[in-house]
Amino acid sequence: MKLSQRVQAIKPSPTLAVTAKAARLKAEGKNIIGLGAGEPDFDTPLHIKDAAITAIRNGFTKYTAVGGTASLKQAIISKFKRENSLEFMPGEILVSSGGKQSFFNLVLATIDPGDEVIIPAPYWVSYPDIVLIAEGKPVFIDTGIEEKFKISPDQLEKAITPRTRMFVVNSPSNPSGSVYSLEELQALGAVLRKYPDILIATDDMYEHILLSGDGFVNILNACPDLKARTVVLNGVSKAYAMTGWRIGYCGGPAAIITAMENIQSQSTSNPNSIAQVAAEAALNGDQSCMVPMIEAFRERNQFLTNALNSIAGIHCLLSEGAFYAFVDVRQAISRLNTQQILQNSSDIAFCNYVLEKAEVAAVPGSAFGCEGYMRLSFATSMDNLQEAVKRIASLLS
């Protein structure tokens, strides 16, 4: 059977591949500690679940408007105003089946074959593949631990060509945990201001999971004049431990939002009606429900960073946001390769070695466009983290 060139250009999710391999080994009786997951280990808060149960009992189980219910859109508008000082109208809001669909809709609505999308690396694994589905060209700007995984204005300017159509910024970052400051975003905005045809996608999914104590800002807080060509992407998955509910949302120029809604109308149509009620309860409800989770992430972040940095050959920064440690393992790879312990000098070989010998599942940095690193999620118990570090330290000693 012939498959399209489009589908052959994309790869299965590396994070899901790690999870699947870890699950297979676990089923074989191995005591696997999974640190590959990209979701909180907390339960959805009770008041959110109760809202969904009430919706079911009230029969709110039919189609809704493609772009989301009017009341959920209003909750999103209120959230943007209250927390981000951003003003949107209902026609500038779209609710989708997860943040991934929001970005998918945006790319399909704005990118033509050959159009270039600038993506700083390391990046969320889905960005480039979604661009490839639209037959666009991902253009990567490489960073590393030396740059704290953040691009400079000069790097951005050098990446721009006449074919550049979109720039993607993700802060706090999955996988690196880096967070752009107001001043850094202002500097990037100064470059983008010179190129009025470039759209800006700011992925704020980890907005509330800030670990450094500083307040959240995105590029529109830094450069309000760019609002007419910026789409703000967000969702309830991470902040409210609602990954399985599949509700993402975005705010942006009405013409782009309408185009995105047209794309969505021919794929999933409306997001799940019950999940929309739950998302509305999350956005309108008591926001203190996030506090215990974020405090736990801060404690785990501090422990994991200190513990990993005590192991010879690996190094990581204290994450400023999200719930990942993005670990530089280049020295460890070099040593193991010299000793002919690894099959090759890739981070994939290293992560396979750690999985098979230490029984700890991690995602290789190359999955995020950053060879020589591994991503460890600390969205798990402290006991799991302590045991995982103990195993990795023993393996690399």
UniProtKB/Swiss-Prot annotation:
List the catalysed reactions: L-aspartate + 2-oxoglutarate = oxaloacetate + L-glutamate; L-arogenate + 2-oxoglutarate = prephenate + L-glutamate
Its needed co-factors are: pyridoxal 5'-phosphate
For whether the record's keyword set contains Cytoplasm, the answer is: yes
Class of this enzyme: transferase
InterPro entries in UniProt = Aminotransferase_I/II_large, AspAT/PAT-like, NHTrfase_class1_PyrdxlP-BS, PyrdxlP-dep_Trfase, PyrdxlP-dep_Trfase_major, PyrdxlP-dep_Trfase_small
Residues engaged in binding L-aspartate? 38, 124, 174, 375
| Gene Ontology CC | cytoplasm
PROSITE patterns the record matches? AA_TRANSFER_CLASS_1 (PS00105)
Q: What is its EC number?
A: 2.6.1.1, 2.6.1.79
**What is an annotated GO biological process for this record, any one?**
amino acid metabolic process
Q: Which residues carry this modification: N6-(pyridoxal phosphate)lysine?
A: 238
What family classification does the UniProt entry report for this protein? Belongs to the class-I pyridoxal-phosphate-dependent aminotransferase family.
Q: What is this protein called?
A: Aspartate/prephenate aminotransferase
Q: Which organism is it from?
A: Nitrosomonas europaea (strain ATCC 19718 / CIP 103999 / KCTC 2705 / NBRC 14298)
